[in-house]
C-alpha cells in the first residue's frame, strides 16, 4: 500500500509537487523517530526548563507553550512523512512556584492547562495561596497530535495572579519544568488531579546569630577605641525572647568601649531595647510613618 501526498499552491496545480512512500517505510521511519526520542528522554536531560515566569498582580494571564522548540523543529522537518502517525505526550509536568510577597499579604494563583487544538481546559489549581511556595506535579492524560503541535495548536500553561499588593507588582515566580515526548503510540489515561507539595521556609538563625559577623559589623561602623593602643573588649550578643507581632531583638550590652556618640544629631542604632531608659537607638518621638514621609518620599 502506498500513500501519495500532494502539496499545491493556491494559484493552481501547475506548481504542485508530489512524492510517494510505502506504508512499511512510513512505519519504519516513525519507529526510528520514536526510539530516538525515547533514548533522549531516558537520558540525563529528560526534563525541559525553558524560563521563569514572573507573575504580576492583576496583569493579563501568562501563557506558555509546553512543546519545546526542539520538538517543533523535528515535527516541521518530518511532518510531511510521519505527521499523521506521531503524537506528543506530556508524561511529566512540574511547576515550581516561589512567592515574592510576604505572608502578611494575601493573594491567589490560578493555574490551568489549555489544549488549544480541542479547546479543553484542565485545572491545576484555581485558588493557590500566593504566599506559599510549592511544587505542582502531574501529567496530561491525552496525546497531542503532532500536526497540531507543529502548527502551534499544542498544550498551553495559563497562569494568573491576584494579590493585595500594588498593581503590576511581582507576586511570585513560576518555574515550569516538563517532559514532551514524541511517539507513534497514543495514550489514554484516567485524568488525575495535580499533586501539590508545599516547600518549607528556611530559618535565618545561622547568619543572624553569628556573633562574629555582628561584632565585626559594630566594630567597623562605630568609633571604638580611637587613639587607644589596646583593642576594645568584645561585646556579647544576647537574643531576647520574641514578643507577638515583634521581631526578635538582639541586645548588645553597653560598656566602656561603646560610647554614646551621635551622628548628624541622631543616635546610632547600636542597641534597640525599648524597655531600657538608657538604651540607645531610635530617638524619642520617632515613627516609621514620619521616616518614610521625610526621608524616603521627601518630594511627595
From Swiss-Prot:
<comment type="function">
    <text>Transports viral genome to neighboring plant cells directly through plasmosdesmata, without any budding. The movement protein allows efficient cell to cell propagation, by bypassing the host cell wall barrier. Acts by forming a tubular structure at the host plasmodesmata, enlarging it enough to allow free passage of virion capsids.</text>
</comment>
<comment type="similarity">
    <text>Belongs to the alfamovirus movement protein family.</text>
</comment>
<protein>
    <recommendedName>
        <fullName>Movement protein</fullName>
    </recommendedName>
</protein>
<dbReference type="GO" id="GO:0044219">
    <property type="term" value="C:host cell plasmodesma"/>
</dbReference>
<keyword id="KW-0916">Viral movement protein</keyword>
<keyword id="KW-1031">Host cell junction</keyword>
<dbReference type="GO" id="GO:0046740">
    <property type="term" value="P:transport of virus in host, cell to cell"/>
</dbReference>
<dbReference type="Pfam" id="PF01573">
    <property type="entry name" value="Bromo_MP"/>
</dbReference>
<dbReference type="InterPro" id="IPR002538">
    <property type="entry name" value="Bromo_MP"/>
</dbReference>
<keyword id="KW-0813">Transport</keyword>
Amino acid at each position: 500500500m502506498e500513500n501519495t501526498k500532494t502539496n499545491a499552491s493556491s494559484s493552481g496545480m501547475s506548481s504542485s509537487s508530489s512524492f510517494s512512500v510505502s506504508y512499511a517505510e512510513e512505519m519504519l521511519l516513525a519507529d526510528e523517530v520514536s526510539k530516538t526520542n525515547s533514548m533522549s528522554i531516558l537520558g540525563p536531560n529528560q526534563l525541559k526548563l525553558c524560563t521563569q515566569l514572573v507573575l504580576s498582580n492583576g496583569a493579563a494571564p501568562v501563557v506558555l507553550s509546553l512543546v519545546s522548540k526542539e520538538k517543533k523543529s523535528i515535527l516541521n522537518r518530518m511532518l510531511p512523512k510521519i505527521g499523521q502517525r506521531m503524537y506528543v505526550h506530556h508524561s511529566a509536568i512540574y511547576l515550581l512556584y516561589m512567592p515574592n510577597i510576604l505572608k502578611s499579604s494575601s493573594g491567589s494563583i490560578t493555574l490551568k492547562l489549555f489544549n488549544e487544538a480541542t479547546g479543553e481546559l484542565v485545572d491545576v489549581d484555581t485558588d493557590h495561596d500566593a504566599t506559599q511556595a510549592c511544587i505542582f506535579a502531574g501529567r496530561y492524560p491525552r496525546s497531542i497530535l503532532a500536526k497540531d503541535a507543529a502548527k502551534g495548536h499544542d498544550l498551553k500553561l495559563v497562569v494568573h495572579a491576584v494579590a493585595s499588593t500594588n498593581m503590576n507588582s511581582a507576586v511570585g515566580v513560576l518555574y515550569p519544568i516538563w517532559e514532551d515526548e514524541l511517539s507513534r503510540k497514543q495514550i489514554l489515561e484516567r485524568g488525575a488531579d495535580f499533586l501539590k507539595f508545599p516547600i518549607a521556609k528556611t530559618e535565618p538563625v545561622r547568619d543572624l546569630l553569628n556573633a562574629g559577623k555582628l561584632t565585626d559589623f559594630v566594630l567597623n561602623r562605630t568609633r571604638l577605641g580611637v587613639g587607644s593602643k589596646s583593642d576594645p573588649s568584645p561585646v556579647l550578643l544576647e537574643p531576647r525572647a520574641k514578643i507577638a507581632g515583634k521581631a526578635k531583638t538582639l541586645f548588645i550590652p553597653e560598656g566602656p568601649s561603646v560610647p554614646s556618640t551621635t551622628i548628624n544629631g541622631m543616635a546610632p542604632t547600636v542597641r534597640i531595647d525599648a524597655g531600657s531608659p538608657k538604651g540607645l537607638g531610635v530617638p524619642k518621638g520617632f515613627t516609621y510613618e514620619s521616616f518614610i514621609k521625610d526621608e524616603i518620599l521627601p518630594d511627595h
